[in-house]
């Protein structure tokens, strides 16, 4: 299902339901139909936000020309957070592998008792890293959460560097800075990653050449940073398809989308009517 949604009002503007995976031809035809509808009304597209799919750049340039094209920041941050959590999991495995193997029976010697204490300490450390793993990727941490993070990363500087890098990634997408400032921060971050083989292999997404497109919204104040408006509407239909068998066909989805567009066009009139009825009833 292809959809174009106004990122300011979160209203669906046009749609097309396909019975196959979309191709460049489908995307181009979809954009041309939308462009023709805008031209007939004297409107133009000033910018567009999409996910990171390779299907969009070619058709956008062919139909709309040179317009600002923003990649959804949510998808970029999601890939980075997944990589950071994976790195934390690898560190847990490395830490668990250092746990000493104990012989059977009660520890009778001082060395054996020391090994038991070390094994329990490592097990406790691994458990804490698992229980509090999301502290490494949260956007904002409270003072108590920061204290917990310092405690569980004590003696593990590589884990603290992961959290520092995550904070730098969030600062890249701060609306208070301009795109030029963000690009300078990104260049500094990439240089730092090149000096660390382990971090470079973990955060490959930050080295991708198309990441700059995720920072376009910093200079375009009216442009949405994410494509959540489209995904929220599509998610509603995916959820509906799980429960209502009739909505799974192409024809049923088209009819349901058309009905939703009709309801949205009449929403303001319904609100005015409801307000007038409440006012008359209260009089």
Summary of predicted features, one role per range:
Residues 1-49, 54-66, 87, 229:
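RNase H-like nuclease fold core
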Residues 32, 88-92, 108, 262-265:
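Short alpha-helix boundary/capping motifs
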């Amino acid at each position: 299902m292809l959809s174009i949604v106004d990122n300011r009002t979160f209203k669906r503007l046009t749609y097309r339901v396909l019975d196959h995976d979309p191709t460049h031809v489908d995307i181009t035809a979809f954009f041309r139909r939308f462009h023709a509808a805008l031209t007939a009304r004297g409107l133009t597209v000033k910018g567009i936000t999409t996910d990171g799919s390779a299907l969009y750049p070619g058709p956008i340039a062919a139909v709309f020309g040179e317009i600002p094209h923003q990649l959804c920041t949510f998808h970029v941050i999601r890939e980075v957070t997944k990589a950071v959590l994976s790195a934390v999991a690898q560190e847990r495995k490395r830490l668990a592998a250092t746990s000493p193997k104990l012989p059977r029976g009660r520890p009778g010697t001082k060395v054996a008792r020391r090994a038991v204490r070390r094994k329990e300490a490592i097990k406790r450390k691994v458990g804490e890293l698992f229980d509090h793993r999301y502290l490494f990727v949260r956007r904002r941490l409270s003072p108590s959460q920061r204290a917990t993070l310092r405690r569980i990363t004590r003696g593990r500087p590589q884990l603290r560097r992961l959290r520092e890098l995550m904070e730098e990634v969030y600062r890249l997408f701060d609306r208070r800075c301009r795109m030029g400032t963000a690009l300078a921060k990104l260049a500094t971050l990439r240089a730092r990653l090149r000096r660390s083989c382990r971090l470079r292999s973990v955060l490959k997404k930050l080295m991708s050449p198309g990441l700059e497109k995720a920072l376009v919204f910093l200079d375009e104040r009216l442009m949405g940073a994410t494509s959540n408006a489209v995904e929220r509407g599509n998610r509603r239909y995916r959820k509906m398809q799980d429960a209502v068998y009739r909505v799974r066909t192409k024809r049923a989805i088209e009819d349901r989308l058309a009905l939703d567009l009709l309801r949205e066009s009449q929403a303001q009139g319904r609100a005015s009517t409801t307000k007038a009825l409440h006012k008359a009833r209260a009089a």
